[in-house]
A protein has these predicted regions:
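N-terminal leader/targeting and accessory segments in enzymes
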Residues: 1-102
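Phosphate-binding loop of NTP-binding sites
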Residues: 99-183
Length: 183
């Protein structure tokens, strides 16, 4: 688990708490969330307000706050949420997707285990699952859930790494030229 001060240092961004937040109320983060519909343990969650062609994650902050989330990565000033989220913490970054990828890259750097990256146009999930079935009896493996192979899915998969793992199997797919380098 990371605390928000550590994450602020990793992302080189300001950590801002609203008027009712204090240092001893900083959440300990074990879950990264990009889809508000997938909230499980609010008190351990850091929500990344991604801005995509399909929508703006910032609009879900008040709802997530009401459901118990207190830690957010935003690309807009947190001032607009001051009244609706009085006990929230905000990490303000230029680009929330880049911040997600940067945090996952830092987390990966803490582990010295083999990582198998499975790429290609077709068959990534089948190959990953086949390798998992083949090696699972002799290794403690972390793997991408389902088809988490996108610019968002890969960092969420990498975040699952724990000291007990001795092998990682991650899918990586791209939609645009240049995306593989970011993964």
């Amino acid at each position: 688990m990371y605390n928000l001060s550590q994450i602020s240092h990793i992302l080189n961004c300001p950590l801002r708490g609203n008027r009712q937040a204090s240092a001893n109320t900083q959440p300990k983060v074990s879950i990264l969330l990009t889809d508000s519909r997938s909230l499980t343990f609010a008190d351990q969650t850091l929500f990344f307000a991604l801005v995509t062609s399909k929508g703006d994650g910032h609009k879900y902050l008040p709802s997530l706050y009401q459901r118990g989330v207190r830690a957010f990565v935003v690309s807009q000033s947190h001032e607009e949420f001051r009244n609706t989220c009085p006990e929230a913490w905000f990490l303000v970054v230029p680009d929330t997707l880049s911040a997600l990828q940067q945090l996952a890259a830092h987390h990966r750097s803490l582990f010295n285990i083999p990582v198998v990256g499975i790429t290609g146009s077709n068959g990534k999930t089948i190959v990953k699952e086949w390798l998992y079935q083949l090696l699972n009896d002799s290794r403690n493996i972390v793997r991408s859930p389902r088809s988490y192979n996108s610019q968002v899915g890969v960092p969420l998969s990498v975040w699952q790494l724990e000291p007990s793992h001795d092998l990682a199997l991650f899918e990586a797919g791209i939609s645009l030229p240049g995306e593989m380098e970011r993964l």
